[in-house]
Amino acid sequence: MTTLASSYDPSSFESRLYAQWEAAGYFVPSDTGEPYTVLLPPPNVTGTLHMGHAFQQTLMDALVRYHRMRGYDTLWQVGTDHAGIATEMVVSRNLALEGKGETRDSLGREGFIAKVWEWNAASGDTIERQMRRLGTSSDWSRSTFTMDPQPSAAVNEAFVRWYEQGLIYRGQRLVNWDPVLKTAISDLEVENVEEDGFLWSIRYPLADGVTYEHIEHDADGNETLRETRDYLVVATTRPETMLGDTAVMVHPEDARYLTLHTARIVLPLTGRHVPVITDDYVDRAFGTGVVKVTPAHDFNDYQVGERHNLPLVNLFTADAKIIDPRKQYPDDESPFVNAGIDWRELDQIQRKRLGQHLAYKIPAQYIGLDRYDARKLVLSELEDLSILVETKPHKLQVPRGDRTGQVIEPYLTDQWFVKMDALAKRGLELVESGQIQFVPPNWINTYRHWMENIQDWCISRQLWWGHRIPAWFDDAGHCHVGHDEAEVRAKHGLGAEIALHQDSDVLETWFSSQLWPFSTLGWPDSQAMAERGFARYLPSSVLVTGFDIIFFWVARMIMATDSFTGQVPFRDVYITGLIRDAQGQKMSKSKGNVLDPLDIIDGISIEDLVAKRTNGLMQPRMAEKIEKATRKEFPDGIIAHGADALRFTIAALATHGRDIKFDLGRAEGYKNFCNKLWNATRFVLMNTEGARFTGVPQPRTEAEKWILARLDKVTAETHAHYANYRFDLLAQSLYEFAWNAFCDWFVELAKPALNNQDTDAAASTRHTLLYVLESLLRLLHPLTPFVTEELWQQVVPRLGITTATISLQRFPQVGDVDTSGYATAEADVEWLKSMVSALRRVRSELNVPPSKQVRLLLQADTADERPRVARFASQLSFLLKLERIDWLDAGQDTPPSAAAIVGELTLLVPLEGLVDMDAERMRLDKEIKRVKGEIGKCNGKLGNATFVQNAPAVVVDQERARLADWTTQLAGLREQRGKL
């Protein structure tokens, strides 16, 4: 007797099965077979599983399970990232919520880091717990945290090697600076937001009594103004930064300013003289064609300053207030160079000192002001001087920190950098030579653009949590780099009497993440490398990740892995789109549209969902709006769908597009799919009680041959879709086979054989039912592991299969069944399906009760179809509840009947006693209209010369055949309509 539950309830078996898999060690690498390695992009330890994680992890798990079933030695390397900034923010917020008065600063570095480790121990396994619920089949014993001793040793080794190779240096450059966090941040952590602002035009007086003839023209080239001016007009969106200007620039070929190339201007409010320089960067058509240059507070201006050797005047403190130069640079108030020296001839030390000296020219009333208060004062004083020419609205791209929401400041500070040019050149070669493949390939263009426009990488962060930079300074300011202080002292002969202090900065998290492909395999420790399979599992097979981190992570892994190991990190890079909500909006806490994958799996009440979406908002005022929208969208909360339904939904949505809209309605549909599979399995089990088969079926019926041929085709499609990372097509193909071919058709077509007195046909049909179902479960397993395992365990004893789990059962292969002689059976069953569909449509439209038997009349111009009808008479009668089947001669009068056409065959159901004649006339009129529409479509294509000339001949022939078929159907329908 079958022990399968009567209804599909994923909560009754999913967690149980995962615990069994893990306990049995099914996910541990086998050390046999060809290696197949997948790298999990390590999620932040601060976070929880969101839809983006679930999306990518489902696809990764499907790949791993698929290859494991094909005999590969699979390693799915998982772990978490220490997430420096995010973790510090979370722990600081938790300290505030505890109400003990403890803060990051009051605890000090060591105390705060101890708190971070406490928090990490309590919450660090959240992601792994959620991944298990999703069904990820990874070897958790190899899970790695980027702050573990092994990867930490790899970070130190990488830093020291690159430093010794001259690739890492310490210097003063512009970085993205968050004035709230008081640290540099990466470009990925900056969001450029379009906002309304202003463009202010300011007169900059020319120095030394210089004047020029200013001429303006209209769009047609007509002169509209000519006057002598002793000033230039400069437009800016950040007037407060003019206090740090060290030049104004014009285009070298701008005729308006040719006489001013050696001039100077008097910088308003400071009285400093700064040069007029020429640079191709200037857009002559924008504004007046005169641009202020503030190298310390604008990334483009910084590049100009580097080209022209301009001094850099840093205006701001770390929290974006105007500096007090006497505190910041106490030794640089007096000039230190000959007053007559050309600024273009300054060396780097002189240039830096000059910038610090020029900061003393900042007027005293500005010192200590917040940047926006300084802006107000600058504008007020410019107005008082009557040199604020114009103020007009202007759209701005404002850089804001993605965590604090604050405007990010281009900030001049001492940081550690990696020289990127040589690394990037090599990284581009590895991709363009084909050693690394991008899927879809168009993302190579994005990769190429970034690599060809690369800048040196700022790797230091002003945080406490993270990998501390392995550099020590003595009291004289000399820097020494090494793996630890003892090595530094020994290497440089520094005795105990020389005080050393380690750099207080930490490395940004991308520095450790770039080492992920090989630090997780034990590098650089030779014993750990041997134990963890460095030589076997590097390069990994595929990286599945989003396009938003191609440069920040993918490119850096390529460059670092090549630099440190001489290998590529992975063979394929499968770039996924980004998950958005059903309206195409980005999912975010602030929008209140985030879906927790576990809520889709296990369900959640509306009250809990509202609480989850509104608690802890950065903008509490949004809570009411979010609650209202949530209650409208999910009035009853979210029902439990189970992990398999979510996974199949994700696969079905995984197109190669840039954006992927997640529709919860799709998950409901795929829950129904799992339910249908469950019910079909119950049918098979109930009809094969006591059966025991081995080997491949020897089919005796056309229906068996047809389904086995379809199985072979869907198997081929499955392998092709995995190879091309087309999970959407994979899901579609498997869905069509499972739902339509197997459940809707073969199960129905099997019923006549199962109820037939031909015991051999019944036995072979039972064998084929079990065989195809078992194969289907294996095909589906990588996408829907739980339901397939639960069903498979019930099916396989009847097939003599003793493998403990479907996870390790061989994946179906093309040719498992020899279907080479099944073409006729395939055609016959497709004909039978057409017959059944046509008659069922007639019965439905006539509202004939399912249990009522009807008479079927058949009519054709030839006798060709009579043998086939005879062969399938029992199936037709069984499936269509036919009282009898009779033939009419061609041209013979027919009684009033409901008609359908299948090929050359007219199907007639006499209406006497069945239906209202008026209703049948309406039905025929409707069917005639439908067929006319199909004929119109065919004629439209065949009447299009471009289609006929350019489409493959087989496609054109198919269209002509369709036209002939529809035309035949129309004639038959019109004939029947005429009789009514």
UniProtKB/Swiss-Prot annotation:
Keywords from the UniProt entry: Aminoacyl-tRNA synthetase, ATP-binding, Coiled coil, Cytoplasm, Ligase, Nucleotide-binding, Protein biosynthesis
Enzyme class: ligase
Catalytic reaction annotation: tRNA(Val) + L-valine + ATP = L-valyl-tRNA(Val) + AMP + diphosphate
EC number, as in UniProt: 6.1.1.9
Record's subcellular location: Cytoplasm
GO molecular function, one term: valine-tRNA ligase activity
Domain of life from the UniProt record: Bacteria
Job description of the protein: Catalyzes the attachment of valine to tRNA(Val). As ValRS can inadvertently accommodate and process structurally similar amino acids such as threonine, to avoid such errors, it has a 'posttransfer' editing activity that hydrolyzes mischarged Thr-tRNA(Val) in a tRNA-dependent manner.
Subunit structure: Monomer.
Family: Belongs to the class-I aminoacyl-tRNA synthetase family. ValS type 1 subfamily.
Domain topic, free-text comment: ValRS has two distinct active sites: one for aminoacylation and one for editing. The misactivated threonine is translocated from the active site to the editing site.
Name the record gives this protein: Valine--tRNA ligase
Organism per entry: Xanthomonas oryzae pv. oryzae (strain MAFF 311018)
Underlying gene: valS
